[in-house]
Amino acid sequence: MRKLLTILTVASALSLTGCGYNTFQTTDEQIKASWSEVVNQYQRRADLIPNLVNTVKGEAKFEQDTLTKVIEARSKATSIQATPELINDPAAFQKFQQAQGELTGALSRLMAVSENYPNLRANQGFRDLQAQLEGTENRITVARNRYIKSVQDYNVTVRTFPSNLTAMVFGYKDKPNFAVENEKEISKPPSVSFDTAPAAPKGAASGAAK
């Protein structure tokens, strides 16, 4: 009787572990594909920055500190190898996410400062790069959201019964995802404006009101 119960228990366990196995395979492939697209779009952004920086340097009085921060942020972001294995390492993923968020912030500041330089904003090369950057940032947002959804689906499968038994048997574990506290910053593309009118100096509005 005990032997029969053992056999039934093992058979039941094997049957349950079969539940969700195909789902794991499918969602894992979805994660890899969406991660690849995230990396591609971040790389595209990084490739645009050298030309953007060189164009901005043509503006003799442009704030050097703003440019330096963009250059340093790009260097930090591109120094992290975004390998397929990175999405299985929470610490490495967090480091990658933070570096990309810092680059987004540096680019946003550069675009904000450029509003004060009408000659730069009238430069066709700069305007073209702005448009390319805006398009890339939008594609980053789309790719990141797909990754977030894929990881959420995968992690739910890892944690819920009976697929959690399959996860234990085959070693499937939670994968890191973009943190909620960074999501707003990451998803906010640098502001792009093609209005060539110079920015109003501080105090102008109050002076006009007097």
Predicted regions and their residues:
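A helix-centric hydrophobic-segment signal that preferentially recognizes long
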Residues: 2-210
